[in-house]
Structures are given as C-alpha cells and as structure tokens.
A protein has these predicted regions:
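Acidic/polar low-complexity segments with low predicted structural confidence
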Residues: 1-103
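Hydrophobic, Leu/Ile/Phe/Ala-enriched alpha-helical segments that form helix-helix packing faces
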Residues: 63, 79-83, 123-131, 195-199
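…and closely analogous acidic/polar surface helices at protein-protein or active-site interfaces
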Residues: 101, 110-146, 188, 192
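Conserved acidic
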Residues: 108, 174
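A short, conserved beta-to-alpha structural element at the edge of catalytic cores
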Residues: 127-151, 198-217
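Von Willebrand factor
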Residues: 135-170, 176-178, 193, 212
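Von Willebrand factor type A / integrin I
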Residues: 165, 175, 180-244
Length: 244
C-alpha cells in the first residue's frame, strides 16, 4: 500500500444510533389570527398632481414665456403718431409672449423635496411638452444649485454654469423651507442670493415654483425672485397677474 494511505485495519468504526425520539408536540396558547378581509382592503391612493391638469400648460406658458414687441402691427399707435405729425422711425408692434429663447429647469432633489419627487418629474415632462424638447434644458441639484448641478446622476454633477443669455430659469425647490429643521444641509439665504446674482450676470431671469403656501415663504425669498405657489389653487390668471 502506498505511503500516507490508511489501511483497512486502521479505519475508524462507524457510529450506531442508540435510539430516536420525536420532539414533543407544541400547543399554541393564543388563537391564530383570522384571514384578512378582502372587502376592507383599500385600493392605492390615486396620484393628484400639485397643479390642476387642465390649466398646467397655460400656467407654464405664462410663467416661462417672455414678452417681446414682435406681435402684430399696432395700428392704433401708428395712427396716433401720424396724427401728431411724428415720423415713424420703426413700426410699433403689439406685445407677444414667446418661449423661443428657451427654458432651463433646475430641479431640487434635496431631502425637503422628497415628498414632491413625482411632481418634479411630471413638471419637467410638462415643460418639455409646452416649450419643446429642443428648447428645454434640465439640471438637477441638491438643496441649492451653487453646490453643484447637472443633467445626470449626482456623481456627474459639477459647478453650475448658467445657460445662454435670455433663457428663462424655472426653479423647482422648497428654497430651504422643507425637510428636518436641524438638517445641516439645508440651503441658506446667502446661497440663493448668490445664485440669483449669477443668473442676473448671465442675463437670465428666474421664477421658482415652491410647494408651500405663501404664508410660509420667508420675506427675503419673495423679494429675491418671483415665486409661484405650487398647488392646485394657483391659476393661470394668478400667474399672469404676479409674474412678469
């Protein structure tokens, strides 16, 4: 036999069972729960968007468009100038609202906006449908764009760079009003003031949709940039009266 092998004489004996006992039966002292009553199960709650679906497109167009004097010929002004003997150096035209300068959506993904994440994505979809995908840019950020922003995942974000001059900026954010009170990441007034200065230097105008009522808005925010209450009570008429 080869070296290192175990011979038959050295094999260990097999163990033999001495007996087998079944475990004692266990008796439950509490009655089992009844089966669920299917008739009492509630269907999942339906999704109710913050903006009324019927007025969303009109509301967004008013909030995101710019007014330019490139509409139809203003005949009344022409007649008035000629009647006063004034020369027509240019043909006066009626004001026209347009979105041809493009829109950039800045969407907040911070903890305070988590309850409104579906509304954020739905609003981005409506903006693209209203303005046109070719005229719509989307950048995401966490709490405030000055900390970094980008169109892709968080790890791809970099320093926020404003778009071309004349682009309308739509900010979807709680402006630091939501989330835990002691959250160290909460955005500050100074950060938003820095963003607005950056946009003004780039010749871009901004409007913010805020998912809180006007009573909760800090006074500095309402003075800093136009705010729109992001809820079903906001109408296109309200936007036309408050947003230039």
């Amino acid at each position: 036999m080869a070296s290192g092998s175990v011979g038959e004489d050295n094999a260990l004996p097999l163990l033999e069972p001495s007996g087998e006992e079944s475990p004692l039966p266990f008796e439950w002292t509490a009655p089992s729960l009844p089966p669920p009553d299917r008739s009492r199960l509630q269907a999942p709650l339906s999704y109710d968007p913050l903006l009324a679906p019927r007025s969303t497109s009109a509301l967004l167009h008013l909030a995101l468009s710019r007014q330019v004097d490139q509409g139809e010929l203003d005949v009344e002004r022409v007649v008035e100038q000629l009647s006063q003997g004034l020369p027509l150096e240019s043909l006066p035209r009626r004001p026209l609202r347009t979105v041809r300068f493009g829109v950039q959506v800045l969407a907040d993904l911070g903890v305070g906006m988590e309850p409104f994440s579906r509304d954020v994505h739905e609003t981005v979809h409506h903006v693209r449908a209203t303005v046109g995908r070719e005229h719509t840019q989307v950048a995401y950020f966490d709490h405030c764009p000055v900390r970094g922003a980008g169109p892709g995942p968080r790890w791809t974000w970099g320093e926020y760079v404003p778009p071309a001059p004349g682009t309308r900026i739509l900010i979807l954010s709680d402006l630091g009003m939501g989330g835990p009170r002691l959250d160290a990441r909460r955005s500050s007034r100074a950060e938003w003031e820095r963003l607005v200065r950056t946009l003004a230097y780039a010749q871009c105008t901004a409007v913010a949709f805020v998912p809180f009522p006007e009573q909760r808005w800090p006074s500095w925010a309402a003075k800093l940039l136009p705010l729109v209450p992001w809820d079903r009570h906001t109408t296109a008429g309200w936007v036309a009266a408050h947003i230039g």
